[in-house]
Amino acid sequence: MMIENQYSLAPALNVDLRKFQRTALIVGMIGVIALIIGFFTTTAEQFLRSYLVGFFFWNGMALGCFVLVMIQYMTGGAWGMIIRRPLEAGTRTWTLCALLVLPILIGVHSLYAWAQPAVVAHDKVLQDKQYYLNVPFFWIRAVLYYAIWGTIITLLNRWSLEQDRTGDLKLAKKLETLSGPGIVIYTFTMTFAATDWIMSLEPHWFSTIYGFIICVGQALSGLSLIVALLVFLGHFQPLSGIVTKRHLNDLGKLLLALVMLWAYLSFSQLILIWSGNLPEEITWYTARLNGGWQYVGAILLIFHFGFPFLLLLSQALKKNPKTIQRIAIYIIVVRIIDVFWLIEPSLHPAHFQLHWLDVVAPIGIGGLWLSHFFYNLQQRPILPPNAPDLEKALNHGRHQH
């Protein structure tokens, strides 16, 4: 028990986290009230599109934490040991995300053309896709996604907590053994979920790379949140004497790798579709490269890839706590813009339009999510006291200047 206390949150930090939790909850409740007002004052389709932007981003934040913690369990890297507990806290928000998906499931007829019989009756392509794109199967798949994610997340968190209590080395092996197939299962199920919730907004369109782009974006979102949080946690015990510049440099390298991978996959998708020039594929880009939406695309090219790429090349910037924290927060903002760009042009293909709900929904849902996240973070020691590689992680970069 003394080992566990050694890595418990400092009292001052607990006070701050409770403040963050309460503040986030207040923001979330104000956001919910604003969403209710929006529900009664705008069209069902606009409300649900805006809600989908907020839901999909924060659901992706939870799943980004999920895949990152599995990578950490598998590799045992020092970079991940000090962020394991925040990542685990992020994964346990899956229960909230399972509730937040309900408006999408309930509003399916207003949100998706393939769920509207009058539209399907005059569309041969949608008729051919009805075996997959039908409402009962859509609901069943959503339940399956959360059942699968929830089961793996519950097992990982249970074994991690049990390892804290017992120090049983077999549990580390169990975490590693489940995480391997878990990463594959996550990628597979998230590809289908992205197809269901986002790609099917434009049901004639398809892309085989799309699911991978979504998965990488989620990992980038999750890591950005955790890096921003880690710098804050590093001001308090027990992490104030543990987090080194080398830890931050390693996490900065991982951020850079994910930024580059997102850009590579996005560019690959564009080149493949543009060179193929097939009517059912090219329409997705013609909607996003015209009517003002091209400026959002340019913003993503410059600020989602170019700017963070240049910043993260610098080792000095990666090792500077304040700078890497600002970069991480900045990436979170452009990640929301990316999700907005994926969803909204399907509703307004002719011209750019930003509805006030497009701003309110991510903030409101984010308040609820962050409140749950900060609550989870307070429930366990900030470091896993009996993890096999903990000592190596604590000494990572300790003697470097």
Show which residues each predicted segment covers.
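N-terminal regions that are enriched for targeting/export leaders
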Residues: 2-62, 130, 392-401
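Long, contiguous internal "core" modules enriched in hydrophobic/ aromatic residues
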Residues: 15-35, 129-300, 317, 387-390
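TerminUS-proximal long segments
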Residues: 20, 118-123, 303-308, 312-401
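Juxtamembrane "helix-exit" motif on the non-cytosolic side of transmembrane helices
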Residues: 38-45, 196-203, 340-348
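Non-cytosolic membrane-interface motifs at loop->transmembrane helix junctions
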Residues: 48-55, 83-85, 202-215, 286, ...
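Transmembrane-helix bundle segments that line or gate the permeation/cavity pathway
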Residues: 55-165, 179-182
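Hydrophobic cores of alpha-helical transmembrane segments in multi-pass inner/ER membrane proteins
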Residues: 62-70, 99-103, 142-154, 216-231, ...
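Hydrophobic alpha-helical membrane-insertion segments
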Residues: 91-108, 257-266, 327-331
